[in-house]
Amino acid sequence: MAKSLNILIAALSLIAFSPFCLCSKAYGSGGYLFPQFYDQSCPKAQEIVQSIVAKAFEHDPRMPASLLRLHFHDCFVKGCDASILLDSSGTIISEKRSNPNRNSARGFELIEEIKHALEQECPETVSCADILALAARDSTVITGGPSWEVPLGRRDARGASLSGSNNDIPAPNNTFQTILTKFKRQGLDLVDLVSLSGSHTIGNSRCTSFRQRLYNQSGNGKPDMTLSQYYATLLRQRCPRSGGDQTLFFLDFATPFKFDNHYFKNLIMYKGLLSSDEILFTKNKQSKELVELYAENQEAFFEQFAKSMVKMGNISPLTGAKGEIRRICRRVNHAY
């Protein structure tokens, strides 16, 4: 743990020189977020998050990808407001029950562990939404990716949207245009789409998310012709026509636990796992050029990924007197 924590702290110490963000206007909101939000009210907040994320990574190498995914799935539904963390209650239908999250979203217990530690340090101060944003950044750094200053000051939602989670989060079998449209609805563009998809350099996906590529991509009983035949043969060994739905596969088979640009190199070799990955290289000229750039130039990918993460983290946050600071992330304050 000590080694991982030292790497994380060393990388984060460089953000004082980062050009990515000093103060960010939140998309869809009248409020501002800024990295120094907790400097006076909870000065150890970021240190606490970093430490717990580092400890979790030592015990579970999959956790960083899970935390990145939580932040993404949170921001794409009603904005970055920690609505994804809420359990179902009398008035709330949890987003955890949606198709994109059911049986796949994870890391909730770790977020609660971080929240508990922060409540001990500075009660009712640091929002669950900000914890998600910080944990996503720290997860990127600890696996070898870029760092950035995280704008802070989000507050937590008092409700959730199951329909929003089902409809607004891009799906593995969506067309390129559908995915781009979902990004544009959030104030993001094609560059953000390609760079943020690069988070698939770590993490896993289930057989059920890409099976159609192996056996019946276009409804004609034939596999996806943009998938390497050799790679498809390997995948079929563990992802049959039926059964094994929950079997996990690396999104980046080359360096599955390292945040790097091998994801884009895989796409050029037609070895993207998901259809939503490979179409970045096969369905749009501009996105193909970006894939080629990032495959060749990891620094360019890292720089844009950091910028796009800040941009995504600014989607419609609750600020000022809106929302609340939950004491427990899985339920609203009036529930106990």
UniProtKB/Swiss-Prot annotation:
Its main location: secreted. The keyword Iron applies. Heme b binds at H200. One of its GO terms (molecular function) is lactoperoxidase activity. The keyword Transferase does not apply. Ca(2+) 2 binds at T201, D252, T255, D260. GO terms for cellular component: extracellular region; plant-type cell wall. It is found in: Secreted. Its cofactor is heme b; Ca(2+). It catalyses: 2 a phenolic donor + H2O2 = 2 a phenolic radical donor + 2 H2O. Binds 1 heme b (iron(II)-protoporphyrin IX) group per subunit. Binds 2 calcium ions per subunit. Induction: Up-regulated transiently by a cold treatment. It comes from the Eukaryota. The active site is at H73 (proton acceptor). Transmembrane segments: none annotated. Disulfide bonds join C42-C122, C75-C80, C128-C329, C207-C239. Slightly expressed in roots. Belongs to the peroxidase family. Classical plant (class III) peroxidase subfamily. Removal of H(2)O(2), oxidation of toxic reductants, biosynthesis and degradation of lignin, suberization, auxin catabolism, response to environmental stresses such as wounding, pathogen attack and oxidative stress. These functions might be dependent on each isozyme/isoform in each plant tissue. This is Peroxidase 72. It comes from Arabidopsis thaliana.
